Amino acid sequence: MSIREQWLENKAFYERRFHAHKFISYLQTYTNTYMSLEQFQEIVLAAADDPNLVGIAISTRPDCVNDAYLEFLAQLKQSRNLDIDIELGLQTVNYHNLVEINRGHTLAEYIDAVLRIKRCGLSTTAHVILNLPGDTELDVIETAKIISVLGVDFAKLHSLYVVGGTELGRRYEAGAFTMISLQEYVERVVTFLEYLDPEIVIQRLVGKGPQDNLLFCNWDTSWWKIKDAIDAEFIARNSKQGSKFDYLNGKALRLKNSRNKG
């Protein structure tokens, strides 16, 4: 089915089922800029003429962001009055773990992509995984800090899921690593959000894995139970997103001046 056909079919479904009137075209699966510029333009424009389209969201990798593609999107945004967002898979700022999980890019490529996107006047979403084997709470905190410093607009959280028949699946079945507990994951999510800029919009707290061949996903717990646990942890801490967002603009100097005034 062509992109245009997918757009028309899904639009009709949401109009009928949810009485929706405005839509965002979401190019999610795989790396949506890993193609020629001409192919990319054709795919993006498949829904661009729809008068009910208000935005386009494009998922891709940090090492597949190029100025020519961004300039096309910036022009489209201006000419069609659309919100355009680029969703990047960061996962973690832990350089060693990015290598270990074979991401194929490092933190540098992510930073470069975000800066280029922002220069073109587009928004960006950070996709992060807070329970990667080898990551600690310090990695979680630093991930929140880097995202905040870069002025990312949106964030999506997803726990790690393991699919059979993959290298990660083989390592999991061999006992090469273990997953943290659900409670520890909940605590990491809350800590991450405490250090995150409160202006960053959370698009997703809990994700789902594919239906088939899963070895591990969400501790075999319903997504809404995980969400409720996150809410409960916030209440227990009497906390909220951004409660520890105090580390920018020369924190050490501000603390020194505060002590001197005291």
List each language-model region with its residue ranges:
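Alpha/beta enzyme core
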Residues: 44-51, 56, 83-86, 144-150
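Distinct, well-ordered alpha-helical segments
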Residues: 37-45, 66-77, 98, 140
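Short, small-residue-enriched loops and turns at beta-alpha junctions
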Residues: 31-35, 62-65, 131-136, 163, ...
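Alpha-helix N-cap and loop-to-helix initiation/capping positions
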Residues: 2, 35, 39, 101-109, ...
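Acidic (Asp/Glu)-rich catalytic clusters
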Residues: 14-18, 43-51, 71-83, 115-119
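Core AdoMet radical
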Residues: 1-10, 14-37, 52-65, 82-109, ...
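Auxiliary Fe-S-binding modules of radical SAM enzymes
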Residues: 154, 162-262
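Conserved C-terminal portion of the radical SAM core fold
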Residues: 108-167, 183-206
